[in-house]
Amino acid sequence: MEVEEAFQAVGEMGLYQMYLCFLLAVLLQLYVATEAILIALIGATPAYHWDMADLLPNQSHSNQTLGKGQAFGDWLLTANGSEIHKHVHFSNSFTSIASEWFLIANRSYKVSAASSSFFSGVFVGVISFGQLSDRFGRRKVYLTGFALDILFAVANGFSPSYEFFAVTRFLVGMMNGGMSLVAFVLLNECVGTAYWALAGSIGGLFFAVGIAQYALLGYFIRSWRTLAVLVNLQGTLVFLLSLFIPESPRWLYSQGRLSEAEEALYFIAKRNRKLKCTFSLTHPANRSYRATGSFLDLFRYRILLGHTLILMFIWFVCSLVYYGLTLSAGDLGGSIYANLALSGLIEIPSYPLCIYLINQRWFGRKRTLAAFLCLGGLACLIVMFLPEKKDTGVFAVVNSHSLSLLGKLTISAAFNIVYIYTSELYPTVIRNVGLGACSMFSRVGGIIAPFVPSLKEVQWSLPFIVFGATGLTSGLLSLLLPETLNSPLLETFSDLQMYSYRRLGEEALSLQTLDPPQPLDKVSSESEEEEEFYDADEETQMIK
């Protein structure tokens, strides 16, 4: 029998698969979320004041009065770290990399650069680890990446300099992003295909819980070095438990290693208490393969070109706004720990809400995505019309804090929807390529996001204007995409001409290419169903 039939025998979601979900979609995501937004606390700037007696006699300057004196401003533009060290005093409420290495004033950009370094590492990790796991196996690459992730993360806490810290943040990002992607692929390949969406939803939900958990931990641990090291205890526990999980049966089967695949399946069956099940794996004698598309095919066909450009921008905006609002939680006033916790917890309602709406005929994928993006954009844009410092009357409720949380709720819902929507818009022959290309732009948004909150130095509401304008624009552009609810899943390029896939007014538009016509007969005309394996290059809901 084939591997899918074998899963029906051993159990598609038995006790052992539930354990794997708990390990790889709950505990692991709590840890992954912590590393992703680590800089939100350890990069925060404690309250401080300036003692400029030597430069400006008989004056004392606080961080609320910076720039009032021309002499002070001129000095600040050229001051180096050692000079700043002599004249600034931080409060003892908590320590951070900003207070230890004096990353304030003209050096404050380095905090954002360290966060951007992490997301640059994620960008590299999701590309390289997908290919490595396809070649060497899911389990081996996952465990190796996880071990290095913990090693580099602990090194963060012992960084002797800012430069060492920034480099290790890049390495943590590469290992964290790569191994968490492979872990989710491994999880999906150990359960029945009907449960893949469930595993993704669980992972996304506990990523949000992980943000709140990190805020709680930071509230009790005020030393940034201690915090950076202790958050790895949870990761170490997950790593040790992961040493005993099997290799992916689907990957082994795809490599022709049938005896090892059978061994992995019997391992799962035993722990599912299916002791009497017996089977023998065989590859199908006659298997037809669909020709796969290339990256250039995304831009060769007119229909795909328009959809791809819009989707790339939407993915970019989702990541930019999601991480921008999360990392700027400390700039909203009040307790930084409460703000960060609320920023995570506010995501939880978005999961059931968006899943319900996208399956309703009167909303569907397109309208729901557009509604959440536009609502989030408008919530952020309204901030520009509010007074900077006024929390009385109506402004006690409608303020930058509440509107930021509304924006976080809506962008989280949009992020969840765009994964599902994108996979339905692309034909099977190019689905992985399309998802991977869109994911690249998501990573670019994550790299830029840490710098956007710094725009508050120019104008206090400017970060919200950026988030709002991009969110609203992406929402309006999403209306140009076709609806996919209850439409048949596209298989080949020729399926793009299906009426049910097209927007009103596109019926007469034939499938056209931007370069000389490409023969469609390169796409297999065989209709026989093939065995498909979950590819590690395909992004999932688990990896924001």
Swiss-Prot record:
UniProt record, GO biological process: amino acid transport; monoatomic ion transport
Catalysed reactions, semicolon-separated: ergothioneine(in) = ergothioneine(out); creatine(in) = creatine(out)
Glycosylation site residues: 58, 63, 80, 106, 286
Membrane topology term: Multi-pass membrane protein
CDD domains reported for this sequence: MFS_SLC22A15 (cd17377)
Keyword annotations: Amino-acid transport, Cell membrane, Glycoprotein, Ion transport, Membrane, Transmembrane, Transmembrane helix, Transport
A GO CC annotation given for this chain: plasma membrane
Annotated segments matching region Disordered: 513-544
UniProt biased composition (Acidic residues): 526-544
Compartments where located: Cell membrane
Segments crossing the lipid bilayer: 22-42, 111-131, 141-161, 170-190, 201-221, 226-246, 303-323, 338-358, 368-388, 401-420, 433-453, 462-482
Coiled-coil segments on the chain, per record: none
Domain of life the protein comes from: Eukaryota
An example Gene Ontology molecular-function term: amino-acid betaine transmembrane transporter activity
PTM info: N-glycosylated.
Assigned protein family: Belongs to the major facilitator (TC 2.A.1) superfamily. Organic cation transporter (TC 2.A.1.19) family.
Matching PANTHER family: SOLUTE CARRIER FAMILY 22 MEMBER
Function, as annotated: Organic zwitterion/cation transporter with apparent specificity for amino acids and their derivatives. Substrate selectivity and the transport mechanism, symport with sodium or facilitated diffusion allosterically regulated by sodium, remain to be elucidated.
The protein, known as: Solute carrier family 22 member 15
Annotated source species: Mus musculus (Mouse)
